Amino acid sequence: MPWPILCRDLLLAALPAIAACSGLHDEMTQYAALGPRYEARTWLATNANPYPLASNRFESATAGAAFVDSLYALGADTVYVMNVQEDSAWVAREGGPYADALLIRLPDTPESRQSLFARGAREARAEGFEPEADHDQRYLYLWWD
């Protein structure tokens, strides 16, 4: 087989893997731009703010923690808090940092993914947003306005 054809065939065979890596990198870069993220259970357990998570959705830290626990029960690999307000003025005024978003690292199992996307869809619709569809992404982002 001539060299240019062999190179073309190898490149064509590798394109799906390259595209998958590129998509994951883009997804990770997108969320990294939103600032630091912290594992949600730990962050909530150590936060002195009485309303640390999306106070327009969760009436207390306990309610926010129960929601995070429900995501883990549905099969989330990891749940992170995002959009964290943690500057010293905010912390002094509120008693601790505040976040209004969660980032769910999705599992590979189809049943768990389906359950997490269904939960995400309910939250999105309640906020007036279009639910995100499962297109084999690694993360699901929830934000409360």
Question: What do these predicted ranges mean?
Answer:
Residues 1, 36, 135-138:
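Intrinsically disordered, low-complexity regions enriched in Ser/Pro/Gly/Gln/His and often acidic
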Residues 9-18:
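Sec-dependent N-terminal signal peptides
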Residues 1-10:
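Bacterial N-terminal signal peptides that target proteins for export
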Residues 109-117:
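Short, conserved charged micro-motifs
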Residues 118-145:
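Acidic, proline/glycine-rich low-complexity IDRs
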Residues 26-109:
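Extended, charge-biased low-complexity segments
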